[in-house]
Amino acid sequence: METIIEWLIRLDVMVAVVVLILFPLVFLGVALRDATVARRMLVYWRVSSLLAITVYLLSAELAVGYLTGFLALLFIPAAVWMGDAIYHPPDSPLPGASRLRAVYRGWRWVVTGLCAFSIPLIMPALPCVVGGGPNLFCDLWFALPEEYFTFVHGEADPTIWGWIAVGALPVYGLYLAFSAVTWYQRTTS
């Protein structure tokens, strides 16, 4: 059972790197030719920055990373479908028949499916946020960000980067609060 869970988490992370990082990075560059798609991709990057914060929190073994990872999996699909405080797409679906818009619409469904698949994988680690004690899921979710950190930063101290991520949380919180207030104002007016 342990190896199946570990395999699923590794698979989830590998697919997430492709779907949530590599593809959107390339697609943003290509999408600059279509202002509507480019604005929607910028919304995605603002929201998905919580994933970067999560990786650095978990690489420093800061348990709040489980919560930020869970929240990112909720916020990202919401953002690709509804926008954020800075850009709110029209209520109508993404119009037009261009290839870029078709690719964006398809990618949006893939992102939604991936996040729906990922949420049950991280939920068993949520008790670790409040000191539920170490368990298999906590250890597995710490291991992959630590591997990433070592690959990218070598011998650097992950604790320093973890605390930088902690410092980024209030900034992200302000952005999120601004988005929530703006969304509320749009829906009640």
PLM regions: where:
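N-terminal signal-anchor/start-transfer transmembrane helix
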Residues: 17-34, 176-177
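C-terminal membrane-adjacent module
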Residues: 106-189
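Membrane-interface helix caps and helix-loop-helix hairpins in membrane proteins
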Residues: 35, 57-66
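Hydrophobic, membrane-inserted alpha-helices
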Residues: 22-27, 48-57
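Short juxtamembrane and helix-loop transition motifs at transmembrane-helix boundaries
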Residues: 1-8, 27-37, 93
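Membrane-proximal helix-loop-helix units in multi-pass membrane proteins
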Residues: 66-140
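Membrane-interfacial loop-to-transmembrane alpha-helix junctions, especially the N-terminal start
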Residues: 36-45
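Hydrophobic transmembrane alpha-helical segments in integral membrane proteins
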Residues: 1-22, 159-166
